[in-house]
Amino acid sequence: MKVVTVCGMGFGTSLMLLMDVQAIGKKHGYDIQGEAVDLGSAKGKECDFMVASGEIASELDGESVEVVAINNLLDKEEIERKVMPVIERVAKGVK
């Protein structure tokens, strides 16, 4: 499955989120490919779901895939709690 992680510039925050999401997926037996991008590049990207900070996620309304909003980017438990249900739905083919 493929995730797109999004931040304002497409470097720091989105790359950190991508590594966290991939590690969480691996921990639960899922292979997650991904791309870290800036907000402008995210719109219309081909993926199964997106992950972004709460502020950025609100800018992604209207995307055809689910956008997971993370409030505390340093809270790995929050990331796992919010991302795992989406990973499991995508793995089952449920959108």
Which residue stretches match the model-derived regions?
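Short acidic active-site motifs
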Residues: V37-S41, E46, E78
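Conserved active-site segments centered on acidic
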Residues: K2-S41
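Short loop/helix-cap segments at secondary-structure boundaries that form the rim of catalytic
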Residues: A42-E46, A57-E66
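Ser/Thr/Gly-rich flexible loops in soluble cytosolic domains mediating phosphotransfer, phosphorylation
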Residues: E66-K95
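Short, hydrophobic beta-strand segments that form beta-sheet elements in well-ordered domains
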Residues: G34, C47-S53
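Short, polar loop motifs at secondary-structure junctions
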Residues: D38-L39, A52-S58
